[in-house]
Amino acid sequence: DNFKKASEMLKSAKRILISGHLSPDGDSLGSMIALSTLLNNAGYEAFAVADINALGKIGFLEGTKSLIPLRNLKRQKKFDLFIAVDCGAFDMMPPEVRPVAEKLPTICIDHHISNTGFGDVEIVDPYASSAGELVWRWAKWNEWKLDKVIAEALWVAMITDTGRFAYDSTSPRTFRAAGDILK
């Protein structure tokens, strides 16, 4: 089970870097924020990195305050684990992230059928509505608690990639995740 393998990788990690794709949309950004908050709440040191000048309409998310701006990535201490979210290929990540990520063990969390399989551990499900849904499933597997920041970020992730639950990617599991997030 890949949730188990990914959770095992976490056990030896001290500092975790999380990134999504270039020009993050709601799923990419929401998944990064939710996952970094979940991991920090669980006692890990997790840092999500993004181009904060390119957030546009989704910059309202409360969790954006904790993002590391891409321009500051080089000033960070070393990381020992990388997690890519909503990223179907390594070259879809920001160029600033790639030289750091390529040296690290990698977990890839993605829902694109075109995913190239670049992670050491893959949490990839092309039937999932969004990367946010997969982050939610991993959180449930680990029994991590959702707080307001996490719930808001996961909600934005899911409504972005489901077209507010209108696209074919929306499934009963998507609605179960959404219902859990709203609690």
Protein language model regions, located:
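A structured phosphate/pyrophosphate-recognition subdomain
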Residues: 1-22, 33-41, 116-183
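Anionic-ligand anchoring segments at beta-strand to alpha-helix junctions in alpha/beta enzyme folds, i.e.
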Residues: 16-78
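Hydrophobic "anchor" residues on beta-strands that sit immediately upstream
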Residues: 17, 47, 82, 106-107, ...
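Fold-independent oxyanion-binding glycine-rich loops
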Residues: 21, 51-52, 85-88, 109-112, ...
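Divalent metal-coordination and catalytic microenvironments
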Residues: 25, 35, 58, 83, ...
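Conserved strand-to-helix beginnings and helix N-cap segments that scaffold or border functional pockets
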Residues: 28-32, 94, 171
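A glycine- and small-aliphatic-rich helix-loop capping segment at beta-alpha/alpha-beta transitions
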Residues: 38, 64, 98-107, 141, ...
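Active-site cofactor/cluster-binding pocket
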Residues: 68-121
